[in-house]
Amino acid sequence: MDTMRERFASTASQLLDSDPRLAVVLAEIGTDGFAAAQEAHPDRVINVGIREQLLIGTGGGLALTGMRPLVHTFASFLVDRAFEQVKLDFGHQGTGGVLVSAGGSYDWPAGGYTHMSPGDIALLDTLDGWTMHVPGHPDEAEALLRHAAAAGDDKVYVRLSVQTNAAARPVTGGGFLAVREGRRGVVVAVGPMLDSVLAAVEGLDVSVLYATTVRPFDDASLRAAIPAGATTADVVLVEPYLAGTSTAAANDALADLPHRVLGLGVGRRELRRYGSVDEYVAGLGLDPRSLRERVTAFLG
């Protein structure tokens, strides 16, 4: 199976052939996947070199001319390093585009903290009007990328990861998918967290919602997952980025119902002995065994 990044390159290359409004902007990273596309469309596959602020500025400039830029590099460079340009060149200028990240929170532990961005979703969430997709499988990544490329002048962030679920689920570019039903609580699994969540809650009487679009937050699906007649609700959010990123959104969705929310994800404390991805996940308490202990302790 190809990776999400490989699927991004092949999908974006196909879209360049069919939509003259699209352009791909790169900052050295990912250029190999676009070699053929750059030869076919030298004016619409642009590599600015290792200049991430210029990467965003170029995308924003293209958007001002009426084009639809697909802007790509590691999340730590795309969002963290170039945040001021994202805020101004897309938000303040009122333009739209698609930011496509790789690396995520801990995809390359050996690369160190410079190549990790556990706070990307939370940071973008301080800005207005961004749709944010977190696919959990290459097929989902392709569907969401195609949706984002065709989304008029909207501002869209697509967060790719090396971690994937075993099978793709239907995605529409909005709304949570109900995967299983229960009565003791609701667990929202974001993107590549789904398989670990399902393994963790096996045998527990809980509902599981699958989120591949996290902004806008799907208030309606969360409320619908609460059993009819319930006077209280317990919700667990399992996100592959900063723990608690969506806690406020869940609280707002359930504002008129007494409830508790547990936000699980990447902690603020930096893990400095990185190891492998699996070791890093375990160190963060996001492996199935740790998730089960934390969920059952919360539900009592």
Can you annotate each of these PLM segments?
Residues 1-153, 161-300:
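Thiamine diphosphate
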Residues 72, 98-103, 134-135, 157-161, ...:
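Short beta-strand segments
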